[in-house]
């Protein structure tokens, strides 16, 4: 039996279109723009509902269906936004179901 290669997939900027979500937040909540202009990742709730990049879901599906890879998520969670990690976990479940269940690695680098 061939051992599957391990692949770590980043969330922000790879799967998750966080740039568009930040723009949407600042448009909907202009009072937040000045406070969070240098650290928008500290906005509570920012990581819960962003859209995935076009093609991201299909790319993960193809990797999974190939049977060649053990897929994991590698992401970071800003210290100034402790809810972000929970939001990211919910985001993964919403878009991928059980694909990344207990397969989320958090780092700050």
Where are the language model's segments positioned?
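Short amphipathic alpha-helices and their capping/turn segments at secondary-structure boundaries
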Residues: 1-6, 58-62
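Active-site neighborhood of HAD-like aspartate-dependent phosphohydrolases
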Residues: 2-47
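Glycine-rich phosphate-binding loop signature in dinucleotide/nucleotide-binding domains
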Residues: 2-3, 66-67, 98
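Residue-level recognition of the N-termini of beta-strands and the immediately preceding loop/turn
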Residues: 5, 69-71, 102
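Short His-Asn-centered micro-motif
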Residues: 9, 50, 74-76, 107-108
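Short, flexible loop segments at the rims of nucleotide/cofactor-binding pockets, characterized by
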Residues: 47-51, 97
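Substrate-recognition element of Asp-dependent hydrolases with the DxDx(T/V) motif
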Residues: 51, 56-88, 92
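C-terminal cap/substrate-recognition subdomain and adjoining C-terminal extension
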Residues: 82-109
